[in-house]
Amino acid sequence: RSNSSKIDYRGELSINPFDLDLDINLGEYKIFQLLNLNAILKEFIKTGLLFNENLSLDVSINAKTKAIDQIFQSTQINFNIVNGKLNLNDTILINDKIGLLKLANSNLFVENNRLILNTDILIDVKDSMSLFSFLNTSKKSRNKFKSALINLDYDFLTNQIEFNNVKIDNKEVSDQFLNIIDDFKDNNSNNLIKSRRLINKLLSIYEG
C-alpha cells in the first residue's frame, strides 16, 4: 500500500528472465481516465522494447467509482506480455445496472509507427430496459438483445476506430447497420450525446 494514497498493490518479480506479476487496486478512481494512454506510455510502447520474448508481464489494475458522470462503475484492466506479444485480454468494464463489456482475442502492436489495438469486444446486456432508459430509447425501437460481439482496430495515434465485424445475439448485422456504426470511427468527436444518438439510430434499424 502506498503511504501517500489509497492505492494497494502487490506482486512478484523475477529478474532473469524478467517476469512481473502485479495487481494494483486504485480504489475510487474515474474509470475513463484509466482508458486514456498518455503520450509517454504510447511512445514507450512504440519503441518496441516491450515486444521481447524474454519478457513476461501480467498487470491487473482495478478501480471503481460512484461518480454520476461515469458510464461504468467498476473496471479491471489487464495488460499482458507473453512471448513478445502484448494483449489486454479479459479487461472488463461493468455497469451495475446494464451489464458489462469485456475484451478478448486482443493484440496490441506497432504498424507503420502507429500503435494499434485489434480486439474482440464482448457486450453482455444484463438488463435491456436499463440500457434503453440510459439511452432514452423510444419505445418503438426497444428490441431486446442479450449480447453483442464487435471486432475492431483502434489507432492510438489518430484516435480512429475501424469496425471489422459486428454480431448481435450471434447474428450478423445488416450493411445499413455497419454504415451507421462507422460514424463512431473518429473517436476524437465521440461523446455521450453523440453516442446515445448513434446507438439509438442503430437500435431503430435492429429487427431483433
What is each model feature region?
Residues 1-208:
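Membrane-proximal interfacial segments on either side of biological membranes
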